Amino acid sequence: MPSVRKSYDEELLQLDTLLARMGHEAGAAIESALTALRNDDIELARSVVARDSQIDASEHEIEHRCLQLLLRQQPVASDLRKVSTALKMVTDVERIGDQASDIAELVLHLHAKSTDAVGVLEDILKMGDDVLKMVNVLVYNSQPMLCGILPKHHALGLDTAAFPL
């Protein structure tokens, strides 16, 4: 029978894995939405809108696991920071998924209207590329942040150089 601490550590690791997977899903959704926008790909846009429910489901699962950890294990210190960080991150990542869906819906709307808004589209694509870079940094950094707060990124001492645009 595994020790209580080992089981708890495994739950924290599973939480980390789920959050990283959700980050990958949100990043892929942004990337697909931008591709749909660039190529006026209606089917890809529809698939992005449909996948949003998967990201929403991931948010609910992660929130549930975090609350279960808080209630059952009553974490303190660094473990509490890990769980509370996951609760905050999951909300932000879910919002990224929603915005990917919004971009995809814009593709559907623009296609239906047959408008030529090249200047606006270029700005949206540039912003989307910047968001995609930030999501990739988030996913890349989420593993060490949930396994232990990095001193260089601790609390308010975020190193903004970690977000190259």
Model-derived segments and their meaning:
Residues 1-165:
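Cytosolic, long alpha-helical scaffolding segments
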